[in-house]
A protein has these predicted regions:
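Short alpha-helix plus adjacent loop in nuclease-associated cores
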Residues: 83-93
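Hydrophobic packing residues within well-ordered alpha-helices of enzyme cores
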Residues: 62-66, 89, 115-116
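Generic beta-sheet signal
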Residues: 4, 98-107
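Non-DNA-binding regulatory cores of transcription-related proteins
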Residues: 96-99, 109-130
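Functional cleft and adjacent loop/helix regions within the main domain
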Residues: 76, 82-83, 144-162
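Glycine-rich phosphate-binding loop signature in dinucleotide/nucleotide-binding domains
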Residues: 44-46, 96-101
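Domain-level recognition of soluble alpha/beta enzyme cores
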Residues: 122-153
Length: 162
């Protein structure tokens, strides 16, 4: 079985308009929701094999909350995840090392919402910031993941934990 945790970055700040989109940090809500969601996930699991994270400032900052509480065997910050389409994200997933059975992806919308809608049997209008979706795939190779072998195990949004 393969397992993916799809997480949209926490809420980012628009205060400093001189910063480009890639460089925007988390705002105060993001700095609250990130730790809250990482605590939630750490009560369910203690390890994920691979963290694949966009290298933008807000995704990097979000990832740190999860790294503090969950063990990752390998971590990769990847600029190609910044505003990737769902098909680009799926292509990345299908190339994950087969030694990994679980992976967390921290990236951006609309790519993540579209990804969830394409590889699972649920339909989301919008994955909110710090929204988490856990999907199991009944297969042994990342290249075999599809909507036909997926099961959504958990969906959690910050507002559900407040």
């Amino acid at each position: 079985m393969k397992k993916i945790y799809v997480l949209r970055h926490s809420k980012s700040s628009w205060i400093d308009l001189s910063l480009g989109d890639f460089h925007r940090p988390l705002n105060s809500r993001g700095q609250t929701d990130g730790p809250m969601m990482s605590v939630y996930l750490s009560t369910r699991i203690d390890m994920i094999d691979f963290l694949h994270c966009s290298s933008s400032v807000r995704t990097y900052e979000t990832s740190k909350y999860f790294i503090e509480r969950i063990k990752f065997i390998d971590i990769q910050y990847d600029e190609s995840l910044y505003h990737s389409s769902s098909s680009e994200i799926i292509n990345n997933i299908k190339c994950y090392d087969e030694q990994y059975n679980s992976a967390m992806i921290i990236a951006h919308n609309p790519g993540l919402t579209n990804l969830i809608n394409e590889i699972s049997d649920i339909s989301l209008d919008n994955l909110p910031t710090t929204g988490l979706v856990e999907i199991n795939f009944d297969c042994t190779k990342w290249s075999d993941i599809s909507i036909d072998n997926s099961t959504v195990v958990d969906i959690k949004f910050p507002k559900q934990l407040k």
